[in-house]
């Protein structure tokens, strides 16, 4: 087995699906950055760094897929919460359709 090839392939798949994963996590609940990282890890076992998440969230904001707001905490340290927009929900539906079609196609050829 070519472990190096598989490792690189897994990395590419993770990078290519991270926006899809983040939008799915935000579908029914708003989260601040650290919570979002933890939710992604909990549901996918993918560990991402803050240095990966925040540029992604900025791109999603520029595309009007998510919004953010600062919320003051009792500790005095504000947290930036991310929420899916209506455009984000529509986009996520399109992405899910593509993903499920792709998944079904892969299952067919993998038998």
Features from the language model and the residues they span:
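Glycine-centered, phosphate/nucleic-acid-interacting loop/turn motifs that mediate DNA/RNA or nucleotide
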Residues: 64
């Amino acid at each position: 087995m070519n472990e190096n090839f598989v490792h690189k392939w897994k990395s590419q798949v993770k990078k290519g699906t991270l926006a899809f994963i983040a939008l799915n996590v935000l579908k029914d609940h708003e989260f601040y950055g650290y919570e979002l990282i933890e939710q992604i890890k909990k549901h996918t076992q993918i560990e991402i760094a803050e240095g990966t998440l925040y540029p992604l969230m900025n791109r999603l904001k520029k595309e009007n897929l998510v919004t953010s707001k600062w919320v003051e905490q009792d500790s005095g340290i504000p947290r930036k919460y991310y929420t899916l927009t209506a455009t984000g929900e529509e986009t996520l539906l399109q992405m899910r359709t593509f993903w499920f079609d792709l998944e079904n196609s892969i299952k067919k050829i993998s038998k």
